[in-house]
Amino acid sequence: MKVRNSLKSLRARHRDNRLVRRKGRVYVINKTQRRFKARQG
């Protein structure tokens, strides 16, 4: 999992990327291409 400052640009890299909030943190998850998984921090 990558840690990024801005997830909006990372989300635009693949059409299956989803922006989710869990436990006060923002994540990008992708079911088909798992290498796009990231957390904001």
Swiss-Prot record:
Domain of life, source organism: Bacteria
Keywords assigned: Ribonucleoprotein, Ribosomal protein
GO molecular function: structural constituent of ribosome
Any one biological process term the GO annotation gives: translation
GO cellular component terms, A-Z: ribonucleoprotein complex; ribosome
InterPro entries, alphabetized: Ribosomal_bL36 (IPR000473), Ribosomal_bL36_sp (IPR035977), Ribosomal_L36_bact (IPR047621)
Xref: HAMAP family: Ribosomal_bL36 (MF_00251)
Similarity annotation: Belongs to the bacterial ribosomal protein bL36 family.
Identification of the protein by name: Large ribosomal subunit protein bL36
Organism of derivation: Nitrobacter hamburgensis (strain DSM 10229 / NCIMB 13809 / X14)
